């Protein structure tokens, strides 16, 4: 179960004001945003890993990951973020809707469904009676991610993780 939860890191959700008949259009936009964010984060971390090693990449990710996500949100005019049942950064703690969705993904994965086929989306009504479109999809972790999120982390890297993320639950 612990390995499964690590495999589901990170996850994304998007919100945008919509009408019910715009579901497929918003789904396509959401999937594209996820691809862009995943690609951008992966290439940035790989570059930092090559230039500065795992500790340098962790420090880079600590500073840049939220900025990359914010810039993508602004450029696409969507709210894009990452979350997980086991967050590293407390700014990424899931809300109730996300937590429920993540729990469903975990159960689906245990039942044998492939992560690449999982997603959930719906239009929800907020406390302000606004209707928003929400989309969440797990992103399987690649090899580079396991350097900091895997089970075989060096003592130096573990110390740096604890220093940068004192409330870390992602390891």
What residue spans do the PLM features occupy?
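Sec-dependent signal peptide recognition
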Residues: 2-11
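The canonical Cys-X-X-Cys-His
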Residues: 142-152
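Hydrophobic h-region of N-terminal signal peptides that target proteins for export
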Residues: 11-19
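Extracytoplasmic c-type cytochrome modules immediately beyond a signal peptide or single-pass transmembrane anchor
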Residues: 20-141, 156-171
């Amino acid at each position: 179960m612990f390995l499964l939860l690590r495999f589901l890191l990170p996850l994304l959700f998007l919100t945008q004001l919509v009408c019910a008949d715009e579901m497929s259009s918003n789904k396509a936009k959401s999937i594209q945003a996820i691809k862009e964010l995943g690609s951008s984060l992966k290439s940035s971390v790989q570059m930092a890993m090559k230039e500065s090693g795992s500790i340098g990449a962790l420090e880079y990710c600590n500073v840049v990951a939220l900025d990359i996500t914010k810039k993508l949100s602004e450029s696409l005019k969507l709210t894009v973020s990452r979350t997980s049942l086991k967050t590293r950064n407390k700014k990424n703690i899931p809300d109730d809707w996300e937590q429920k969705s993540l729990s469903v993904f975990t159960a689906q994965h245990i039942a044998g469904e492939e992560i690449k086929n999982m997603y959930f989306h719906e239009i929800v009504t907020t406390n302000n009676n606004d209707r928003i479109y929400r989309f969440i999809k797990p992103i399987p972790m690649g090899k580079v991610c396991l350097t900091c999120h895997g089970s075989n982390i060096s003592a130096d890297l573990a110390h740096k993780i604890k220093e940068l993320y004192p409330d870390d639950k992602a390891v």
